[in-house]
Amino acid sequence: MKRRDFFQLSAAAVGSFAISDSLALMHKLKAQEKADSVESLLGPIKPVKDQATGLELLLLPDGFSYTSFGWSKDMMDDGVKTPGAHDGMGVVATNGSEITLIRNHEVGGARAAFGSDSMTFDSMAGGGCTTLVFDVDAGELKKSHSAISGTVRNCAGGVTPWGTWLTCEET
């Protein structure tokens, strides 16, 4: 390859990268502009304070409220700290105003399991599921504990017709 050809090819490559980056940025900005202009069917949305923490964590329409619970590192009733990486979850049971929620924790890598030995599949896997019982009328968490432990990247899952939870590892 001649020196002149090399420089022409290099200039063309640099120019195409600059154009592709500009086009990608323009596409991203247009997508954000479109998302910002979408109106809620329930009216305009605005920051709303969490009833548990007082923090503005969500944007909601007028008249809507929420209460957060089961934060990472909160102590559960079984003496275990709530794992992080909250992910897929579902309501598996109801009893009056109480719902039982099973929540996946998509923890990957070599981390110690969070649950007791009796419910741990692999002691060097930090994922699993937790069970939370929440009273929707009182707006408070009633119980929480480890459900399974020692799995990897529990991401998706689903409630079965029998009111149980299937958790799926993302490996």
Kindly give the residue locations of the regions a language model identified.
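Structural signature of eukaryotic scaffold interfaces centered on beta-propeller domains
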Residues: 87-95, 155-161
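N-terminal secretory signal peptides
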Residues: 1-2
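Short, conserved, GDST-rich strand-edge loop motifs in beta-rich repeat architectures
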Residues: 104-124, 171
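Short coil/turn segments that connect the beta-strands within blades of beta-propeller domains
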Residues: 99, 162-163
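Blade-edge beta-strand/turn elements of extracellular beta-propeller
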Residues: 54-72, 79-80, 135-148
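Beta-propeller blade signature
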Residues: 126-135
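C-terminal segment of N-terminal export signals and the immediately downstream linker at the start
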Residues: 20-60
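N-terminal export signals
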Residues: 5-28
